[in-house]
Structure formats: C-alpha cells, structure tokens
Amino acid sequence: MIERKFTDDRLAALYDAFCPPPTRRDDFAFYLPLLMSARAVLDVGCGTGALLRLARESGHAGRLCGLDPAGGMLNQARRRSDIAWVHGDLASVGWEREFDLVVMTGHAFQEFVADDEIRAALAAIRAALVGGGRFAFETRNPLVRAWERWPRIVAALGARL
C-alpha cells in the first residue's frame, strides 16, 4: 500500500526538505559512481528522483529512468524533463534487457514483504537487465534493531512517536 504522504502533491513537495541534500547522502555517494558508469539506469522506487537528477547534473549522458507507484512523488521528479519518469510498479512494466543497472535506494526493497512479491520483483528486475547488468540495493538490517533508539531520539527532539 502506498502511503498518503507519497501520493499527495502537497506532502510530496515537502519530502526532499526533510532529506539531506543529495550531495551529502552516504547512500548516494555509494550509488552515484555505479550510475555514472552505466549507459542505461532504472531507479525502482525513485520517489522525487533525487538520485537520477544528481546523476544527470553530474554529467550522465545516457538513459535514466525512474519508476514509482506514487504520483505525488513523480510529480516532483518531473521537474527534470530529461529523465524518463514512469508511474507504476515492477508488475506494471515489461522491460526486457534494457538497462545496465537497476537500483533501489532508500530501503525501497523492504516494501516487498511476502516471498512471492520478492520473487516477482527479482524476476522483473532480471528481465529488465542486459546480460551482465547489475542490481544494487540496500535494506535495513533487522539485527541492528535501530527502531529501539527512535523513541529516545524523538524524545530528545521534544516530540513524541
């Protein structure tokens, strides 16, 4: 299920304000060299398109494509018209051997919960990749149990969960 904050244009417009600038994100520092070395890139769950916009601003001259099911987020992404933005999910597209690199940043992969969802997503990603293509993603490590620190952090900010 897509959260309302990602579909509502007014809320999606605020999303990037709550994130570090793309040039200061550790995950983007990891992903950007991968994007820059790939001819054609698909960002699954691209959100507002910050990573693809950074790649284009950094000189990527090839094909950049963002896929996201949240229309509000894509409306923000579409501020950059030299990148293809697709409204949908992996089940709604049928790319065949079109991308050198597929990425899923910001823990987007953890949206797949059930085994059949994971298998279907991986099959769609594999189909979208050219021979020798790469898939890069990250997800939270449940063994770290980061959520246990959240109440303390939120309380220190004078807020509540």
Set out the residue ranges of the language-model regions.
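A conserved beta-strand element that flanks and buttresses the S-adenosyl-L-methionine
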Residues: 103-105
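A short acidic, Gly/Pro-enriched loop at the edge of an enzyme's catalytic core
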Residues: 94-101
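Class I SAM-dependent methyltransferase SAM/SAH-binding core
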Residues: 49-92
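Conserved class I S-adenosyl-L-methionine
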Residues: 1-45
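A short His-aromatic
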Residues: 110-112
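SAM-dependent methyltransferase
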Residues: 138-161
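A short glycine-rich, Lys/Arg-flanked "PGG" loop and its adjoining helix->strand segment in the class I
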Residues: 119-131
